[in-house]
Design a protein with these regions (language model features):
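Generic beta-sheet signal
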Residues: 4-8, 74-82, 130, 155-159, ...
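Class I SAM-dependent methyltransferase SAM-binding "motif I" and its flanking Rossmann-like core
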Residues: 95-153
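Short active-site oxyanion
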Residues: 25-32, 104-108, 156-157
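A contiguous loop/helix-start segment that scaffolds small-molecule binding in enzyme catalytic cores
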Residues: 2, 77, 156, 163-281
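Glycine-centered tight-turn and secondary-structure capping sites
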Residues: 92-94, 249
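Glycine-rich, flexible N-terminal cofactor/catalytic loop recognition
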Residues: 1-58
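General beta-strand structural signal in soluble alpha/beta enzymes
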Residues: 34, 107-112, 159, 184
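Conserved helicase motor
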Residues: 55-62, 136-139
Length: 281
């Protein structure tokens, strides 16, 4: 093989989920760049692959990318893998592939496992258009800002989340996006694989009853529907439902305003006006 870079997808859980081609290429390349050499070595040993590994992660990728491109230009062939799944999707690799493209190095993808796609295709949510935004920020304020920024997208929203933040994130989804359909995938392709469906609040209540929350999560949220100016559910009821789910009153008003295509002031007037027939829009 002439010098080139292969971007190779590896299993996200079940070790049978790898292609024949991926195994063959990993046996033939001069080196394999990976996030954690120990994790990748266990994977390689399982398939009888003995090629040398090089660490490539977020803390060294800028300098390492230049080094690896230079080696490829000298005729070596390398492979890029992540700890699990497809590289570059919320994993290191962008700088290396970008540098390769800039240098005129040939880059080939070996497609395979991806938690994003595995979760999406079993979700039951629309897949004709989706927006993947990786991991949400760890801080609540920043997390809610991201959710609000994509609230009007007419696409299924997809995020990754860690087990220690999943219930907080579901609470933020309720506060910012309301009662949209939500699907959560956990431990995909592994022994305890699970798909949870409902509203964000329903799934959160299910999770908090467990002794422990483990595994990596993929969170998918139904797309924003075009406002038709009408609803069978009164605005007051929508707000009461959100408050009952633990959402602050002003956050509930903000969420309902977005869903109904109204300003926060208009919603506030509707629920603060003189008592009488309930108004809805």
């Amino acid at each position: 093989m002439s010098g080139r870079l292969y971007v190779v997808a590896t299993p996200i859980g079940n070790l049978e989920d790898i292609t024949y081609r991926a195994v063959r290429i990993l046996k033939e390349v001069d080196w394999i760049a990976c996030e954690d050499t120990r994790t990748t070595r266990r994977l390689l040993d399982h398939y009888g692959i003995s090629r040398p590994t090089l660490s490539y992660h977020e803390h060294n990728e800028t300098g390492r990318a230049a080094e690896l491109i230079a080696r490829i230009q000298q005729g070596e062939t390398g492979a890029l893998v992540s700890d699990a799944g497809t590289p570059l999707l919320s994993d290191p690799g962008y700088r290396l592939v970008h540098a390769a493209a800039e240098a005129g190095v040939r880059v080939e993808a070996l497609p395979g496992p991806s938690a994003l796609l595995a979760a999406l295709v079993v979700s039951g949510l629309p897949t004709d258009r989706f927006l993947f935004a990786g991991f949400l920020p760890a801080k609540q304020g920043q997390r809610r800002n991201v959710l609000e920024s994509v609230a009007e997208e007419a696409a299924t929203l997809v995020f990754y989340e860690a087990p220690h933040r999943i219930t907080e994130t579901l609470e933020d989804i309720t506060a910012t996006l309301g009662q949209r359909p939500v699907v959560v995938g956990r431990e995909l392709t592994k022994l305890h694989e699970e798909t949870l469906r409902g509203t964000a609040d329903e799934i959160r209540k299910s999770l908090i009853t467990r002794d422990a929350i483990r595994g990596e999560f993929v969170v998918m949220i139904g797309k924003a529907e075009a406002s038709e100016g009408g609803s069978d559910v009164p605005i007051e009821t929508m707000i009461e439902t959100l408050i009952g789910a633990g959402i602050e009153r002003m956050d509930a008003i903000k969420t309902v305003a977005r869903e109904r295509g109204l300003s926060k002031r208009e919603v506030y007037k509707l629920i603060s006006g003189p008592r009488g027939p309930k108004q809805s829009r």
